Amino acid sequence: MMLIPTHHFRDIERKPEYLQPEKCAPPPFPGPAGAMWFIRDGCGIACAIVTWFLVLYAEFVVLFVMLVPSRDYAYSIINGIVFNLLAFLALASHCRAMLTDPGAVPKGNATKEFIESLQLKPGQVVYKCPKCCSIKPDRAHHCSVCKRCIRKMDHHCPWVNNCVGENNQKYFVLFTMYIALISLHALIMVGFHFLHCFEEDWTKCSSFSPPTTVILLILLCFEALLFLIFTSVMFGTQVHSICTDETGIEQLKKEERRWAKKTKWMNMKAVFGHPFSLGWASPFATPDQGKADPYQYVV
């Protein structure tokens, strides 16, 4: 007897009650193009506010405790420009990482009509997420906080109140890089300022009282050291993940590699855009990644 090839529809959690595409409601009407993405999560919003507060605190101490009272105008101007530029780029990267759709799969598109429109060939399957009722592209994972399946999801970061995925990984990498740079810059300036205050009169090295100055500088030093270590490790982890073309979740789950292997340079260009330019370091440049839309899997 000859068997007729059939298409396959698989549920990611292998629950029989979810295997019927008719169980899904029709997908919601798409929102306007360019609509802002924002996750309403209390913990994430609180972490994002704390992030901005800490950067603005560092800005306050650097400007009004160290640079403004300094008699070396060249030192104050140069360091003020560098620190403010890095802080601006860090906060801009934070906003882009937080407000950019990380690559959410259309919700509720696992309908019978949509599956038939894919025109699957024999031997091909599609995977469905029972939680958001979406057809999962290859390398997509469901986020319990965003309540969506995210393409190439690396992890959900509460500090940016968003998932780090296919569309916003560049901005997250820039955010960690610029935070690490301003943390290092702040530590260096705190060290020089302490030396200056020890050599000079404490009452002349700051517009604040000596005890207040010491407390503000120690708090900034602790904050800068903590975030320098944290963001440097995160930056290195992200760059390694990009170069190996393997997300944090894929590494954690030890998922079998089903995608084509590319060079490290090609993987970097896939995240930061083609070709290499100063736009790689800009949170305002949107990378042209030329992404595909792979809903189908060959098994």
UniProtKB/Swiss-Prot annotation:
Disruption phenotype: Homozygous knockout mice are viable, fertile and do not display overt phenotype. Male show a modest reduction in body weight. Zdhhc3 and Zdhhc7 double knockout mice show a perinatally lethal phenotype.
Pfam families named among the record's database cross-references: DHHC
Lumenal face residues: 69-72, 193-214
Enzyme class: transferase
Gene that encodes it: Zdhhc3
Active site as annotated: 157
Source organism of the structure: Mus musculus (Mouse)
Known outcome of mutating residue 132 to S: No effect on ZDHHC3 palmitoylation. Changed protein structure. Decreased protein-cysteine S-palmitoyltransferase activity
Sequence ranges assigned to domain DHHC in this UniProt record: 126-177
UniProt name for this protein: Palmitoyltransferase ZDHHC3
